Design a protein with these regions (language model features):
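Charged, amphipathic alpha-helical coiled-coil/dimerization segments
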Residues: 13-15, 92-150
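Residues at secondary-structure transition points
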Residues: 22, 26, 53, 71-74, ...
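N-terminal helix-turn-helix DNA-binding core of bacterial DNA-binding proteins
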Residues: 40-83
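N-terminal leader segment of winged-helix/HTH proteins
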Residues: 1-49, 97-99, 152-155
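Short, hydrophobic-biased segments on the C-terminal half of alpha helices
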Residues: 73, 91-92
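Pre-recognition alpha-helix immediately N-terminal to the DNA-recognition helix
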Residues: 30, 37, 57-61, 122
């Protein structure tokens, strides 16, 4: 077997030569693979609870992004990395599913607080427990991978 060597490539942006370290690329690829596996797990878990992955993320953002039991549309837009109007639509759809409710602020009635409903809290509790366990498994795999070279799964 021929040992894998580092390669040099020229950066288009700077024109400088950049050394590609194969071990670093393997670690980045392994991290990306594990991240995608976690995201696929999350999507399946959400759908099993009859919510969309985005609705699960919304519930998580309301409950976990701030120290309050509610969040504003702007805070949720930042948490979800979405546009304000996209989050408004997501909140409206979640309201139809009885996952969240909106409360207008006082004295500024334009200020909207988004709260979880009892149903939203129950869905979030079940999904959060599953995700917490999966994060533990992911951390174990990542730690093991940092100590050894990742093996191909043959897929």
């Amino acid at each position: 077997m021929v040992p894998i060597q580092s390669k040099k490539i020229r950066s288009r942006a700077s024109g400088n030569s950049v050394k590609l370290d194969h071990k670093m690329l393997q670690q980045l690829a392994w991290f990306r693979y594990q991240l995608r596996r976690f995201l696929r797990f999350s999507e399946k878990a959400a759908r099993a609870e009859r919510v969309t992955p985005q609705q699960y993320q919304l519930l998580l953002g309301i409950s976990g992004y701030t120290s309050r039991p509610w969040a504003t549309i702007g805070e949720l837009a930042e948490f979800l990395q979405e546009r304000h109007n996209a989050v408004v639509g997501l909140v409206e759809r979640a309201m139809k599913r009885r996952l969240v409710r909106k409360v207008q602020g006082t004295p500024d009635r334009r200020f909207i607080r988004v709260h979880l409903t009892a149903r939203g809290e129950a869905v979030l509790a079940r999904l959060a427990e599953q995700h917490h366990q999966e994060v533990g498994h992911l951390a174990s795999r990542m730690l093991a991978a940092s100590r050894t070279r990742p093996k191909s799964s043959g897929r």
